[in-house]
Amino acid sequence: MAIHTVIAEQSWYNDYNFMEVIQMNKNESAENYLETILILSKSLPVVRSVDIANELGYKKSSVSVAMKNLREKGHIIVDKSGFITLTQTGREIAEMIYERHELLSSWLIRLGVSKDVALEDACKMEHVISKESFDAIKKAIL
């Protein structure tokens, strides 16, 4: 059975445009990589693909493909030594995602959600929550 047939039979497919779902997953992946680079840059003198692979538990080859895509989009710079730095736009995206993650996870923990579940849920929420909703939550809890 073709993948498109299987997907079309899924109930969620009728509610979402399949290509939008694919694009959303690509954006989420890119945002996770940018956030990871930001976090690693706070504790390491330089960030390399191998550092990202170790942090995320991914194969170095997968990280290399992602770094190529982020570089092509202008979110990172990779120098001749393989050191990765965020561009201004890459840093802005990473800081936005990081702020969302930190605020949402701490909020969920204060609501009584276990730390593990709060961290996992915040990681999902940080990519899909609207600016309006995030700002409202931020205003309410700060």
Task: Locate the predicted segments by residue.
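N-terminal helix-turn-helix DNA-binding core of bacterial DNA-binding proteins
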Residues: N25-Y58
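Residues within the alpha-helical elements of helix-turn-helix
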Residues: E55, I93, R110
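A short, conserved structural fragment
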Residues: K73-D79
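Basic amphipathic alpha-helical segments that dock to polyanions
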Residues: Y33, I52, V63-K73
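Basic, amphipathic "hinge/linker" alpha-helix immediately C-terminal to the N-terminal HTH DNA-binding motif
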Residues: G82-R100
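C-terminal regulatory/oligomerization modules of transcriptional regulators
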Residues: I3-Y16, L44, E120-L142
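Key DNA-contact positions within bacterial/archaeal DNA-binding proteins
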Residues: S61, D116
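The short coil/loop that forms the "turn" connecting the two helices of the helix-turn-helix
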Residues: G57-Y58, S81, V113
